[in-house]
Regions:
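Flavin (FAD/FMN) cofactor-binding and adjacent substrate-gating region
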Residues: 77, 98-175, 181-188, 289-310
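Glycine-rich phosphate/pyrophosphate-binding beta-alpha loops
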Residues: 52-54, 60, 150-152, 357-359, ...
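N-terminal Rossmann-like FAD-binding beta1-loop-alpha1 element of flavoenzymes
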Residues: 12-36
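C-terminal lid/capping helical subdomain adjacent to the catalytic/cofactor pocket in oxidative enzymes
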Residues: 2-10, 31, 122, 354, ...
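Flavin-dependent oxidoreductases
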Residues: 23, 182-305, 317-328, 333-341, ...
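FAD-binding beta-loop-beta segment adjacent to the flavin cofactor pocket
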Residues: 130-137, 328, 339-381, 386
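Glycine-rich FAD pyrophosphate-binding loop
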Residues: 30-48
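Dinucleotide-binding Rossmann-like beta1-alpha1 core, especially the glycine-rich loop
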Residues: 53-131, 252, 260, 270-272, ...
Length: 420
């Protein structure tokens, strides 16, 4: 990547090298816009490169479904469009049902999904067994929800592919540098400040994941963003294919391109930090209604002080400057539930594990789009652990908005200003 001269002027500056920022950089540079992207670590080093790798429409908040359906259409051709391997495989997504209440909820979701033209089916127990031949006979599975058009991809590989393709189209990149401020004048964006230097652009996309709220706060924008530390484990490779992404009651299972299984338990650790007090009122209802969703870690400030650094780097996971240790208890929970449902996996060993910070918002849907009080500023953050699959479509929509085109999906309900 060539050196960047801060005396120049760009059409668009993107803060954040996750899949949202990298896909936006690709679609905009392909359209001929001059793009500069900042990433404080390496591309995909936060949650974009550390998630489970599901690419799904199924079981989403219906406000996200049009985005998810548009994203699937893009994923189907991305390896050709980017001219790179992404580990894309369209094997469908299965959510197991273990009670009559589960079945009722799945039928209700499927009925509404039909109005969107989604191909979701409700499977009987026998049909589930046919799709998952290794399922334990005594697993008490009554049925499942299945969407055949859902798929999977390799998170870090896909994120990097978008950035590399963007660079081929002329995008410029600054890695290892943190943007400290969004600069404005007369109510409009003028650029960003990094390492004391001003980089100029009339349009800026803030896609900085868990760091977005702090950047926006200096402009008076309220974004009550919190972070959850989620853990993923990787097993040794299977000798047989496991084509579907599967959601057990608590554990998600995906087979990676190298044959290994990636496992993750729903929820994670809520690491208490300074912003926890600032945003507490926004999350009281969520924590009361979903106490199992995250475990509060009151000692997290000490973790950063006492730690000697982040866990050792892994070959296929981008390194990060954050100290984000995986939780061994979560790994054990994931292994236990996986082998309960699939006894043939009982001898699989965990080869690696990692964690990443999920940036969340109180209503569990993202903030996407322009900020009316600051001309030229757009936001893409708060994807609450289910943004990876949306990434291509979000990048394309941001590109369309900046070019003055009609966006390919309605994002009016994702306003970054909805929290006041």
């Amino acid at each position: 990547m060539k050196p960047v001269n801060d005396t120049e002027h760009w059409d668009v500056i993107i803060v954040g090298g996750g899949i949202m920022g990298c896909s936006a950089a690709y679609y905009m540079s392909r359209a001929g816009l001059r793009v500069l992207l900042f990433e404080r670590d390496t591309p995909g080093s936060a949650q974009s490169g550390r998630n489970l790798g599901f690419v799904r429409q199924q079981a989403r908040d219906f406000r996200e479904v049009p985005l998810a359906m548009g994203a699937i259409r893009l994923w189907q051709d991305l390896e050709r469009d980017l001219d790179r391997k992404l580990g894309w495989y369209q094997g469908g997504n299965i959510v197991l049902a273990l009670s009559e209440d589960d079945i009722a909820q799945q039928f209700a979701w499927q009925k509404e999904a039909q109005g969107y033209g989604l191909d979701t089916q409700i499977l009987s127990a026998a049909q589930v067994a046919g799709k998952l031949p290794g399922l334990a006979p005594g697993s008490n599975v009554l049925g499942a929800m299945f969407t055949a058009s859902d798929g999977r991809a390799e998170p870090a590989q896909a994120t990097r592919a978008f950035l590399d393709a963007a660079v081929e189209h002329g995008a410029e990149v600054i890695l290892g540098q943190r943007v400290s401020k969004l600069e404005t004048a007369a109510g409009a964006i003028t650029g960003v400040r990094c390492a004391g230097r001003l980089y100029r652009a009339k349009t800026v996309i803030c896609a900085a994941g868990a760091k977005s709220a702090a950047l926006l706060r200096s402009l008076g924008i309220v974004l009550p963003q919190e972070i959850i530390r989620a853990t993923v484990a990787k097993t040794e490779p299977l000798v047989v294919p496991f084509p579907h992404c599967v959601s057990c009651p608590m554990t998600g299972i995906r087979q990676a391109a190298d044959g290994s299984l990636h496992l993750s338990v729903a929820g994670g650790e809520y690491d208490v930090r300074m912003d926890s007090v600032r945003y507490a009122r926004w999350y009281m209802k969520v924590r009361k209604e979903q106490p199992e969703a995250s475990r509060i870690n009151y000692l997290s400030p000490l973790r950063g002080i006492l730690s000697r650094g982040a866990p050792p780097p892994l070959a296929d996971i981008p390194p990060t400057s954050d100290c984000v240790p995986p939780n061994p208890t979560r790994i054990e929970q994931a292994l236990t539930e996986t082998t309960d449902f699939f006894p043939a996996f009982s001898n699989l060993r965990v080869r690696a594990s990692w964690a990443g910070y999920i940036d969340t918002l109180p209503d569990m849907i993202p903030a996407i789009g322009p900020v009316s009080t600051t001309g030229g500023l757009l936001v893409a953050t708060g994807f609450s652990g289910h943004g990876f699959g949306l990434g291509p479509m979000v990048g394309r929509v941001l590109s369309q908005l900046i070019q003055g085109k009609q966006p390919g999906a309605d994002i009016s309900q994702f306003s970054p200003e909805r929290f006041g």
